[in-house]
Amino acid sequence: MKMYKLMLGLVLAGLVSLSAQAIEQRDYHKEVIGKDCKSCHDQGVKNYPSDQACLQCHDVDELAEETARSEEDKWQNPHNNLHYGKELPCIECHGEHEAKKPICSNCHTFKYDKHKE
């Protein structure tokens, strides 16, 4: 019985520890920390946010301007690129609770030094 209680205690302690670590948030979203999860998770807390949720705070035209490159590399802009224009879903490159690589890196080798995972 003592062994059972010990094992149960260890399992419960592990679960509490995991749940505390499970919700990771990026520093650049400090202003939304503490708000209701539904402010971003507009399709339910178990689903990814829609682009409309991201666009409540972020403007795609401003992002495209901020990430613009020189003329010869202008289509290497993650927010206005040759393949998707400005239509690529935000979650393809960005994740709030876990790091993500830009979708471009699946085929291309150019880097985005300021990429926020």
From Swiss-Prot:
Residues binding heme c 4: H83, C104, C107, H108
| Naturally occurring in which organism (per UniProt) | Shewanella woodyi (strain ATCC 51908 / MS32)
State one molecular function term (GO): oxidoreductase activity
The entry's cellular-component GO terms read:
periplasmic space
* Location of the protein in the cell: Periplasm
The UniProt annotation places heme c 1 binding at C37, C40, H41, H97
Signal peptide per UniProt: 1-22
Tell what triggers its expression: Part of the ard operon, which is induced under anaerobic conditions. Expression is further induced by acrylate and methacrylate. Not induced under aerobic conditions.
| Keywords on record | Electron transport, Heme, Iron, Metal-binding, Oxidoreductase, Periplasm, Signal, Transport
Top-level taxon of origin: Bacteria
Q: What is this protein called?
A: Acrylate reductase cytochrome subunit
Bilayer-crossing residues are none
What pH dependence is recorded for this entry?
Answer: Optimum pH is 7.5.
State the protein's purpose: Heme c-containing subunit of the ArdAB flavocytochrome c, which catalyzes the reduction of acrylate to propanoate and supports dimethylsulfoniopropionate-dependent anaerobic respiration. In vitro, can use the artificial electron donor methyl viologen. The natural electron donor is probably a low-potential cytochrome c. Also shows weak activity toward methacrylate in vitro (at a 22-fold lower rate) but cannot use other tested 2-enoates, including crotonic, fumaric, sorbic, urocanic, cinnamic, p-coumaric, caffeic or ferulic acids.
Q: Which residues bind heme c 3?
A: H79, C90, C93, H94
Query: Which sites bind heme c 2?
Result: H29, C54, C57, H58
How the cofactor is bound: the record states:
Binds 4 heme c groups per subunit.
Its quaternary organisation is: The ArdAB flavocytochrome c is composed of a FAD-containing subunit (ArdA) and a heme c-containing subunit (ArdB).
Q: From which residue to which does any coiled coil extend? A: none
**What are its E.C. numbers?**
1.3.2.-
The keyword tRNA processing appears for this protein? no
Q: Which cofactor does it need?
A: heme c
Q: What is its main location?
A: periplasm
